[in-house]
Protein backbone atom coordinates (compact mmCIF):
# COMPACT_ATOMS: atom_id res chain seq x y z
CA UNK A 1 0.00 0.00 0.00
CA UNK A 2 2.73 2.44 0.97
CA UNK A 3 4.88 1.41 -1.97
CA UNK A 4 2.05 2.40 -4.33
CA UNK A 5 1.15 5.54 -2.32
CA UNK A 6 -2.36 4.29 -1.57
CA UNK A 7 -3.83 6.17 1.42
CA UNK A 8 -5.58 3.96 3.95
CA UNK A 9 -6.78 4.05 7.54
CA UNK A 10 -7.58 1.69 10.38
CA UNK A 11 -11.31 1.78 10.96
CA UNK A 12 -11.68 -0.71 13.77
CA UNK A 13 -9.17 -2.96 15.56
CA UNK A 14 -6.92 -3.88 12.67
CA UNK A 15 -9.52 -3.48 9.91
CA UNK A 16 -7.84 -1.45 7.17
CA UNK A 17 -9.77 0.52 4.54
CA UNK A 18 -8.73 2.54 1.50
CA UNK A 19 -9.31 6.28 1.95
CA UNK A 20 -10.59 6.56 -1.62
CA UNK A 21 -11.84 3.30 -3.13
CA UNK A 22 -11.08 -0.42 -3.32
CA UNK A 23 -10.35 0.27 -6.98
CA UNK A 24 -6.95 1.48 -5.74
CA UNK A 25 -6.20 -2.07 -4.61
CA UNK A 26 -7.20 -3.54 -7.96
CA UNK A 27 -4.96 -1.13 -9.81
CA UNK A 28 -2.09 -1.91 -7.42
CA UNK A 29 -2.40 -5.65 -8.08
CA UNK A 30 -2.60 -5.10 -11.83
CA UNK A 31 0.50 -2.92 -11.69
CA UNK A 32 2.37 -5.63 -9.79
CA UNK A 33 1.28 -8.26 -12.31
CA UNK A 34 2.27 -6.09 -15.25
CA UNK A 35 5.83 -5.74 -14.08
CA UNK A 36 5.87 -2.31 -12.45
CA UNK A 37 8.96 -1.28 -10.49
CA UNK A 38 9.97 -4.31 -8.42
CA UNK A 39 6.85 -6.05 -9.73
CA UNK A 40 6.33 -9.38 -11.44
CA UNK A 41 5.77 -10.52 -14.99
CA UNK A 42 2.34 -12.12 -15.07
CA UNK A 43 0.25 -13.11 -18.08
CA UNK A 44 -3.40 -12.53 -17.23
CA UNK A 45 -6.25 -14.23 -19.10
CA UNK A 46 -9.69 -12.84 -18.37
CA UNK A 47 -12.15 -14.37 -18.90
CA UNK A 48 -10.70 -17.87 -19.02
CA UNK A 49 -12.46 -21.10 -18.07
CA UNK A 50 -10.76 -24.15 -16.56
CA UNK A 51 -11.56 -27.44 -18.26
CA UNK A 52 -9.20 -29.97 -16.71
CA UNK A 53 -5.93 -30.40 -14.81
CA UNK A 54 -3.73 -33.47 -15.24
CA UNK A 55 -0.47 -34.51 -13.59
CA UNK A 56 2.22 -36.83 -14.96
CA UNK A 57 5.33 -38.06 -13.13
CA UNK A 58 6.75 -39.15 -16.48
CA UNK A 59 6.78 -35.63 -17.93
CA UNK A 60 9.73 -33.25 -17.50
CA UNK A 61 9.51 -31.36 -14.21
CA UNK A 62 8.56 -28.08 -15.89
CA UNK A 63 5.65 -29.79 -17.67
CA UNK A 64 4.26 -32.17 -15.05
CA UNK A 65 0.98 -30.29 -14.82
CA UNK A 66 -1.14 -29.99 -17.94
CA UNK A 67 -3.94 -27.45 -17.65
CA UNK A 68 -6.69 -27.27 -20.26
CA UNK A 69 -8.29 -23.83 -20.38
CA UNK A 70 -10.66 -21.89 -22.56
CA UNK A 71 -7.62 -20.19 -24.06
CA UNK A 72 -5.54 -23.28 -24.68
CA UNK A 73 -3.41 -25.83 -22.85
CA UNK A 74 -0.66 -24.77 -20.44
CA UNK A 75 2.18 -26.89 -19.00
CA UNK A 76 3.77 -26.01 -15.67
CA UNK A 77 5.86 -27.34 -12.79
CA UNK A 78 3.24 -26.22 -10.26
CA UNK A 79 -0.35 -25.04 -10.10
CA UNK A 80 -1.63 -22.58 -7.50
CA UNK A 81 -5.34 -22.90 -6.73
CA UNK A 82 -6.69 -19.60 -5.38
CA UNK A 83 -10.41 -19.94 -6.00
CA UNK A 84 -11.80 -18.91 -2.64
CA UNK A 85 -14.52 -20.90 -0.92
CA UNK A 86 -18.29 -21.23 -1.06
CA UNK A 87 -19.14 -17.82 0.40
CA UNK A 88 -21.66 -15.57 -1.34
CA UNK A 89 -22.75 -17.91 -4.17
CA UNK A 90 -24.64 -15.10 -5.92
CA UNK A 91 -21.30 -13.65 -7.10
CA UNK A 92 -20.25 -16.98 -8.61
CA UNK A 93 -18.52 -18.84 -5.78
CA UNK A 94 -18.32 -22.61 -6.40
CA UNK A 95 -16.73 -25.69 -4.87
CA UNK A 96 -14.08 -26.02 -7.60
CA UNK A 97 -11.23 -25.67 -5.10
CA UNK A 98 -12.55 -28.58 -3.06
CA UNK A 99 -13.11 -30.68 -6.18
CA UNK A 100 -9.53 -30.14 -7.29
CA UNK A 101 -8.25 -31.03 -3.83
CA UNK A 102 -10.25 -34.26 -3.94
CA UNK A 103 -8.95 -35.00 -7.44
CA UNK A 104 -5.35 -34.82 -6.19
CA UNK A 105 -6.10 -36.66 -2.92
CA UNK A 106 -5.43 -33.67 -0.68
CA UNK A 107 -6.90 -33.70 2.83
CA UNK A 108 -9.80 -31.29 3.17
CA UNK A 109 -11.32 -30.16 6.46
CA UNK A 110 -15.10 -30.46 6.17
CA UNK A 111 -16.14 -27.00 4.93
CA UNK A 112 -18.69 -24.93 6.82
CA UNK A 113 -19.56 -21.22 6.83
CA UNK A 114 -17.21 -18.99 8.82
CA UNK A 115 -17.26 -15.29 9.68
CA UNK A 116 -21.04 -15.55 9.61
CA UNK A 117 -23.97 -14.34 11.77
CA UNK A 118 -25.44 -16.87 14.21
CA UNK A 119 -29.14 -17.72 14.48
CA UNK A 120 -31.36 -19.00 17.28
CA UNK A 121 -34.70 -20.71 17.81
CA UNK A 122 -37.46 -18.19 17.07
CA UNK A 123 -39.30 -18.79 20.33
CA UNK A 124 -36.18 -18.64 22.49
CA UNK A 125 -34.97 -15.52 20.71
CA UNK A 126 -38.30 -13.66 20.91
CA UNK A 127 -37.38 -11.62 24.04
CA UNK A 128 -34.25 -10.30 22.31
CA UNK A 129 -35.57 -9.73 18.78
CA UNK A 130 -36.77 -6.29 19.90
CA UNK A 131 -33.11 -5.34 20.40
CA UNK A 132 -32.44 -5.65 16.66
CA UNK A 133 -30.01 -2.95 15.57
CA UNK A 134 -28.46 -2.53 19.02
CA UNK A 135 -24.67 -2.74 19.11
CA UNK A 136 -22.29 -2.82 22.08
CA UNK A 137 -18.74 -3.94 22.96
CA UNK A 138 -18.62 -7.42 24.54
CA UNK A 139 -16.32 -10.29 25.36
CA UNK A 140 -17.55 -13.43 23.60
CA UNK A 141 -16.14 -16.92 24.00
CA UNK A 142 -16.75 -20.55 23.13
CA UNK A 143 -15.06 -23.85 23.89
CA UNK A 144 -13.29 -24.98 27.05
CA UNK A 145 -9.66 -25.28 28.12
CA UNK A 146 -7.59 -26.16 25.04
CA UNK A 147 -10.41 -25.26 22.64
CA UNK A 148 -11.29 -21.96 24.34
CA UNK A 149 -11.53 -18.98 21.98
CA UNK A 150 -12.38 -15.46 23.09
CA UNK A 151 -12.74 -12.09 21.39
CA UNK A 152 -13.25 -8.56 22.69
CA UNK A 153 -15.28 -6.99 19.90
CA UNK A 154 -18.61 -5.37 19.08
CA UNK A 155 -21.81 -7.42 19.01
CA UNK A 156 -24.94 -6.61 17.00
CA UNK A 157 -28.44 -7.87 17.80
CA UNK A 158 -30.55 -8.88 14.78
CA UNK A 159 -34.12 -10.13 14.35
CA UNK A 160 -32.84 -13.71 13.95
CA UNK A 161 -29.83 -13.73 16.26
CA UNK A 162 -26.42 -12.13 16.62
CA UNK A 163 -23.94 -10.52 14.27
CA UNK A 164 -21.20 -7.91 14.45
CA UNK A 165 -17.39 -8.32 14.46
CA UNK A 166 -17.25 -10.36 17.68
CA UNK A 167 -19.85 -12.87 16.51
CA UNK A 168 -18.35 -13.18 13.03
CA UNK A 169 -14.98 -13.98 14.61
CA UNK A 170 -16.33 -16.53 17.10
CA UNK A 171 -18.45 -18.24 14.40
CA UNK A 172 -15.27 -19.71 12.93
CA UNK A 173 -14.66 -21.61 16.19
CA UNK A 174 -18.19 -22.33 17.40
CA UNK A 175 -19.28 -25.96 16.98
CA UNK A 176 -22.91 -26.99 16.41
CA UNK A 177 -24.56 -27.96 19.69
CA UNK A 178 -22.12 -26.07 21.91
CA UNK A 179 -22.76 -22.82 23.71
CA UNK A 180 -21.44 -19.27 23.66
CA UNK A 181 -20.74 -17.18 26.74
CA UNK A 182 -21.06 -13.43 26.39
CA UNK A 183 -19.98 -10.75 28.85
CA UNK A 184 -22.21 -7.81 27.99
CA UNK A 185 -20.28 -5.42 30.26
CA UNK A 186 -16.65 -6.54 30.01
CA UNK A 187 -15.18 -3.30 31.36
CA UNK A 188 -16.72 -3.58 34.83
CA UNK A 189 -17.23 -6.11 37.62
CA UNK A 190 -21.03 -5.90 37.64
CA UNK A 191 -21.53 -7.77 40.91
CA UNK A 192 -19.17 -5.40 42.70
CA UNK A 193 -20.67 -2.33 41.01
CA UNK A 194 -24.26 -3.29 41.86
CA UNK A 195 -23.38 -4.06 45.46
CA UNK A 196 -21.70 -0.67 45.76
CA UNK A 197 -24.75 1.05 44.24
CA UNK A 198 -27.03 -0.75 46.69
CA UNK A 199 -25.44 1.14 49.56
CA UNK A 200 -26.81 4.50 48.42
CA UNK A 201 -28.72 4.45 45.11
CA UNK A 202 -32.50 4.77 44.96
CA UNK A 203 -32.53 4.33 41.17
CA UNK A 204 -34.37 1.46 39.58
CA UNK A 205 -32.01 -1.40 38.75
CA UNK A 206 -32.57 -0.81 35.02
CA UNK A 207 -31.56 2.83 35.38
CA UNK A 208 -28.48 1.88 37.39
CA UNK A 209 -27.46 -0.57 34.66
CA UNK A 210 -27.53 2.25 32.10
CA UNK A 211 -24.07 3.26 33.31
CA UNK A 212 -22.65 0.04 31.84
CA UNK A 213 -25.02 -1.27 29.14
CA UNK A 214 -27.45 0.40 26.69
CA UNK A 215 -30.84 1.27 28.19
CA UNK A 216 -32.77 -0.99 25.79
CA UNK A 217 -30.66 -3.93 26.87
CA UNK A 218 -31.06 -3.07 30.55
CA UNK A 219 -34.85 -2.82 30.21
CA UNK A 220 -35.04 -6.15 28.37
CA UNK A 221 -32.95 -7.87 31.01
CA UNK A 222 -34.78 -6.67 34.12
CA UNK A 223 -38.14 -7.53 32.53
CA UNK A 224 -37.20 -11.22 32.84
CA UNK A 225 -37.42 -11.31 36.65
CA UNK A 226 -39.62 -9.31 39.04
CA UNK A 227 -36.80 -9.36 41.58
CA UNK A 228 -34.93 -6.97 39.27
CA UNK A 229 -37.85 -4.58 38.76
CA UNK A 230 -37.26 -2.37 41.80
CA UNK A 231 -34.84 0.22 43.18
CA UNK A 232 -31.37 -1.24 43.57
CA UNK A 233 -31.32 -0.35 47.26
CA UNK A 234 -34.35 -2.63 47.81
CA UNK A 235 -32.99 -5.61 45.87
CA UNK A 236 -31.61 -8.67 47.63
CA UNK A 237 -27.94 -9.54 47.32
CA UNK A 238 -28.98 -12.82 45.71
CA UNK A 239 -31.01 -11.04 43.01
CA UNK A 240 -28.22 -8.59 42.22
CA UNK A 241 -25.58 -11.31 42.05
CA UNK A 242 -27.78 -13.39 39.72
CA UNK A 243 -28.35 -10.37 37.47
CA UNK A 244 -24.61 -9.67 37.35
CA UNK A 245 -23.90 -13.30 36.55
CA UNK A 246 -26.43 -13.38 33.70
CA UNK A 247 -25.05 -10.22 32.15
CA UNK A 248 -21.40 -11.17 32.62
CA UNK A 249 -21.67 -14.75 31.36
CA UNK A 250 -24.81 -14.93 29.21
CA UNK A 251 -25.04 -18.55 28.01
CA UNK A 252 -26.48 -19.06 24.54
CA UNK A 253 -26.69 -22.05 22.21
CA UNK A 254 -27.13 -21.05 18.55
CA UNK A 255 -29.21 -23.31 16.35
CA UNK A 256 -27.22 -22.47 13.23
CA UNK A 257 -25.75 -19.75 11.04
CA UNK A 258 -26.90 -17.51 8.20
CA UNK A 259 -25.00 -19.85 5.87
CA UNK A 260 -22.75 -19.28 2.89
CA UNK A 261 -24.96 -16.50 1.55
CA UNK A 262 -23.78 -14.28 4.42
CA UNK A 263 -20.37 -15.81 5.14
Task: Please provide the spans of the model-predicted regions.
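Flavin (FAD/FMN) cofactor-binding core of flavoprotein oxidoreductases
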Residues: 19, 23, 114-123, 250, ...
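A conserved beta-strand/loop element that lines the FAD pocket in flavoprotein oxidoreductases
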Residues: 33-50, 111
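Short beta-strand to alpha-helix junction loop
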Residues: 12-31, 45, 88-92, 119, ...
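Short hydrophobic core segments
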Residues: 50, 74-93, 100-102, 154-160
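Glycine-rich active-site loop/strand segments that organize a redox cofactor
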Residues: 2-12
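A glycine-rich dinucleotide-binding beta-alpha-beta segment and adjacent secondary-structure elements
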Residues: 45-47, 223-263
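A conserved short coil-to-beta-strand element within the FAD-binding core of flavoproteins
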Residues: 46-63, 116
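An anion/pyrophosphate-binding glycine-rich loop and adjacent beta-alpha core
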Residues: 106-110, 116-238
Amino acid sequence: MQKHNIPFHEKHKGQLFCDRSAEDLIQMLLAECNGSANGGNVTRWQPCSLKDIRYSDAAPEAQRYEVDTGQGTVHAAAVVVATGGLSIPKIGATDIGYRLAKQFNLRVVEPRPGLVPLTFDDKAWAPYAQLSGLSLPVRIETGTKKTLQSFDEDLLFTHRGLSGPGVLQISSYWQVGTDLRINLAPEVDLAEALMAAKQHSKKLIANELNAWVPSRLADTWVSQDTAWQRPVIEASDKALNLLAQRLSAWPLTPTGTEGYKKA
